[in-house]
């Protein structure tokens, strides 16, 4: 149990930190940083992980085409959602971009299993009332946290505009736009849960047939999701780089350092998911989706928020903005814990 908890904490910290290196890139536009991130994260890192941990690509040939097609379509939506997540972080910072996106993802994603079966078909499957109301209570608190975080962002924008003597509504990258982008991204990114639900069982059976540990099946699932989602990301960034005439920025003298920071982002992002899968297997099927789920998500939100504070995202924010941020953070962590307790009631 202790080992599983340590791995879950580590996974949450890695996910919370993954976007931080973006703040240290130089002479890159948003499009340059995130396009490279998606190329490395969605294609290169998953391939290396599959070769090293799955002993090659044989496992993918053992999965039926119908499963792969369903996973691929859902993953395209997830890819769009993650693109919006990166855009939200660029607009409103690490603390808000992360917490609002993850909060929305948890809220919508927790409802999906009640209406989608393991085959990806629509089927109402509500849990017992005690489980249902506990989870709904937790999700309501998560939603309250998202609202407080959004309010904190709007207050912060007003504070910063007052200091700079600007009119808040005239700023190009408005806080409200960033918040909406994070929410829409979170909704679309719930397609990850749909894709994972479809692919989980087939990949576990294939992994067992190959003599691999069951937790390694998640690497196969993530490869399909990441590559499919990466297609959406590559199309978007190719258009964005062209329309904003940003291709030339790749010639900067800071390219080497920037690529180094982006590789760190990619490794943290992918490794966080793999580490959590391992943590869940160590904790067992019951504790994995309760204790592990709570620790992973709570630590990621806490880490991202603290990182944003440390690098000065809230330096010019008033005490009112910070107060709303802290209330939102506490609400989200509390809500995540209650959702996990509700899941545990059904274990």
Residue ranges and their predicted role:
Residues 1-347:
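Polytopic alpha-helical membrane proteins, predominantly small-molecule transporters/carriers
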């Amino acid at each position: 149990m202790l080992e599983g908890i340590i791995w879950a904490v580590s996974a949450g910290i890695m996910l919370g930190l993954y976007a931080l290196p973006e703040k240290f890139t130089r002479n890159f536009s948003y499009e340059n940083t995130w396009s490279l991130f998606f190329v490395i994260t969605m294609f290169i890192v998953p391939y290396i992980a599959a070769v090293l941990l799955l002993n090659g690509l044989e496992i993918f040939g053992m999965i039926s085409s119908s499963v792969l097609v369903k996973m691929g379509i859902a993953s395209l939506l997830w890819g769009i959602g993650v693109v919006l997540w990166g855009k939200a972080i660029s607009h409103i910072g690490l603390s808000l971009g992360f917490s609002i996106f993850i909060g929305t993802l948890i809220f919508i994603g927790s409802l999906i299993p009640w209406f989608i079966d393991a085959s990806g078909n629509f089927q109402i499957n509500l849990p017992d009332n005690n489980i249902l109301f506990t989870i709904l209570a937790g999700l309501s608190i998560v939603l309250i946290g998202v609202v407080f975080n959004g309010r904190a962002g709007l207050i912060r924008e007003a504070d910063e505009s007052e200091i700079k003597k600007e009119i808040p509504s005239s700023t190009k990258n408005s806080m409200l736009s960033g918040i909406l982008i994070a929410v829409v991204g979170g909704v679309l990114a719930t397609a990850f849960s749909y894709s994972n639900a479809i692919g989980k069982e087939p990949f576990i059976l294939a992994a067992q047939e190959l003599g691999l540990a069951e937790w390694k099946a998640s690497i196969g699932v993530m490869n399909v999701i990441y590559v499919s989602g990466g297609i959406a990301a590559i199309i978007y960034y190719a258009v964005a780089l062209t329309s904003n005439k940003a291709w030339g920025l790749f010639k900067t003298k800071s390219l080497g350092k920037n690529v180094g920071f982006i590789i760190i982002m990619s490794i943290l992002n992918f490794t966080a998911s793999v580490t959590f899968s391992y943590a869940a297997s160590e904790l067992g099927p019951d504790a994995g989706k309760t204790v592990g789920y709570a620790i992973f998500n709570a630590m990621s939100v806490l880490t991202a928020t603290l990182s944003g504070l440390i690098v000065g995202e809230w330096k010019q924010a008033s005490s009112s903005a910070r107060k709303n941020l802290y209330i939102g953070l506490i609400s989200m962590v509390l809500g995540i814990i209650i959702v996990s307790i509700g899941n545990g009631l059904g274990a």
